[in-house]
């Protein structure tokens, strides 16, 4: 069953999938005893309300990112899911991207060494939204990816945003996230850029990795490059000098899979087998929202450092 207030969308869904029942009243869907689980893909401001209603109706929930608009709302939903003994999962779909998962495993293998910093670029000219700004629309992806790859959440942030298209919402944002151990991650998101870019770079002490979601030849490239200090003393260059090491560029073979399909299969498996969705549970969704709120606060304060 599908619920939407847009009559045209319901007609289109019915035309594509004649067997699917449609309704404009989401409460009718939640009241249907045949339905065990729901997927919520509404405007962000409704995520908390609809998820709370679905859990109260005894449904398992897969909610699109971000889980809610505040950390407190996220934790309330987490408590509601635990009380109802239902699965609550957040749609951080890039955690299910085959390239990103390969990068995660490669970092864990120790081949990259200590991570120095990471940066991401997620830009395009549009599409524009009017319910949330570019930060809340695009950055949840990159924050979730960094938290996943680094295995921990950011502790502070400083950010700047700009309303450059005559909009009342920020069309672009630059955010720097501080992670434990001195690691940095920089995020650039924009609706006002001439190029569509979906890239992440990881710089480590041994190797460097670039993931490009739009690269059809090879989404992941491993650069066997590094910089190290010499132990020898050089009077003309101070107490040490830096040596750069150039190596090969490797494009690993990755068995690609549709991330949305993998996400859906993971959710169904959790529901059918009573497994907790560790990869993208409410706790992780709440960390992403808390980070977003801190970034927004820093933007509102003109770039001040804000603890998360």
Where are these regions (language model features)?
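NAD(P)-binding Rossmann-fold cofactor-contacting core
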Residues: 1-16
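Conserved SAM-binding strand-loop segment of SAM-dependent methyltransferases
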Residues: 19-26
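Hydrophobic residues in well-ordered beta-strands that form the structural core
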Residues: 24, 63, 88-90, 119, ...
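Beta-strand-loop-alpha-helix segment that lines the small-molecule cofactor/substrate pocket
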Residues: 37, 43-95, 110
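Rossmann-like dinucleotide-binding domain that binds NAD(P)(H)
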Residues: 125-195, 201, 215, 283
